[in-house]
Amino acid sequence: MQPCNPIGYVHSLESFGSVDGPGVRFVVFLQGCALRCKYCHNPETWAAEGGEEWTVEQLFQRVWRYRNYWGRKGGITVSGGEPLRQMEFLTAFFELARSKGVHTALDTAGQPFRPDDPDYLAGFDRLMKSTSLVILDLKEIDPEKHRQLTGRDNANILAMARHISDLGVPLWIRHVLVPGLTDDEESLRRTADFIRSLKTVQRVEVLPYHTLGLFKWQKLGISYPLPDAVPPTAEQVRRAEELLEVAKYPG
């Protein structure tokens, strides 16, 4: 069934993204996320009711102005928040973009994925048909550690990664490295094993933890759960990249 003029709730727009997929990207940040990651740098996107309302056509008209900057590699990335919370809007937006030949990337943590819901899967599979690339943030491979880190289980997230791979959609995998929290070598080895089981992974990236979003927690009056966390050293990043076999996935 065709979406009936779905409305999207957009947190913000970035016209010249350079780290959100291949080439120069126009990045759309959608509102709403159910995860509560301890290192989240966009906590203002959590609330589903926030953001500015856009129609698919309005948003695409804004994005389309920047097409001359994308070249052959660039395009559109939709991030968040968690964009899969607005899947109807996202699907209509990507379908319009692909009809114009635009490369589309979905930047997601996968939390809304429902592997046991046939109706949801049908909608998800439709979205994947107009998705050129999925950028998946694998936060933690161990279920209990994932719950401690985000407040949610990760079984459905891992199932989503497998499903995307089975559909043949290209994947980039990202992992945020927080010393003392997400740098356990055994967990990183298990993550590498999982990534190796996926057939469509093109790139694996280690993202060093940073504190650039700390002021947002303070502005919102939320206690920051990692007051003593520090960014990883270059050697810690190198070791994580080695364990995750980053060199095998040049992208």
Task: Write out the residue ranges for each language-model feature.
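Short cysteine/histidine-rich metal-coordination sites, predominantly Zn2+-binding motifs
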Residues: 51-61
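Auxiliary Fe-S-binding modules of radical SAM enzymes
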Residues: 1-19, 172, 177-251
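N-terminal [4Fe-4S]-dependent radical SAM core
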Residues: 1-30, 35-52, 65-72
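Short, conserved loop/turn and helix-capping segments at secondary-structure boundaries
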Residues: 53, 151-154, 231-234
